[in-house]
Amino acid sequence: MIALLSPAKTLDLTKPNLDIETSKPIFISEAEVIMNNLKELEIQDLCPLMKISEDLGVQTFTKIQDWNTIYYGDEKPFVLSFKGEAYRGLDADDFTKEDLEFCNDSLRILSGLYGALKPLDGTKAYRLEMGTKISIDGSKNLYDFWGNKIMDSLLKDLENHKEKVIINLASNEYYKSIKQIDKKVRVITPVFKERKGIEYKVVTVYAKKARGQMVRYITKNRITKSEDLKNFDLYGYEFNERLSEGDTWVFTRD
């Protein structure tokens, strides 16, 4: 069983006091191809492409120019660097070494630049969303560039797991990069809803955080069987069998 998360736009590269070796992303060669294309762009090209302000464009341009493929094994792990809502829910800063090692086996972070990241892959500062409309070496976009590579890597990783199931906690933008995987293995998609009057509705900021909270639940409880996720009860959520349908599992909170 492997869970999926989307990356966050914000990175914190402050190094923690952590004695654990980080790894080089498996698709570093593909990332280098993408970055070599991005290095040819000027700030005035990046801003409309990535839909960012000029200030962010300057920062992004610098990150792109400074990016390289040199790894020393002491970089900050990506799982501790990302700072979006999902990662606030994951709250991996208090993970033990054993927690991080389990998480490294049971979580993959989808990425426009790196394809699929392990939590303990070493961080290099970057900004590139999967939906960015950029052509890389003749490809139509990043989905076209990645093709089936990300999906195939996940299927290979699943070979080492007893239960061949994907827990899809990624956004649609990122899941789209592996959308054919449900024809190969079972994909369970948890959905998190809040009570609004007489109905339950998805509240984006809470839903994003809950995705990370579920990964935390998986990690802290060493969960390897998908059925055990129905016991997820952090922060007031509970499995709602009535609203769930097939492999879309709904968790509600009053």
UniProtKB/Swiss-Prot annotation:
UniProt-listed GO biological process terms: response to hydroperoxide
Source organism superkingdom: Bacteria
One Gene Ontology cellular component annotation held by this UniProt entry: cytosol
HAMAP family linked: UPF0246
PANTHER family: PEROXIDE STRESS RESISTANCE PROTEIN YAAA (PTHR30283:SF4), PEROXIDE STRESS RESPONSE PROTEIN YAAA (PTHR30283)
Matching NCBIfam families: PRK02101.1-3
Protein name (database record): UPF0246 protein CPR_2119
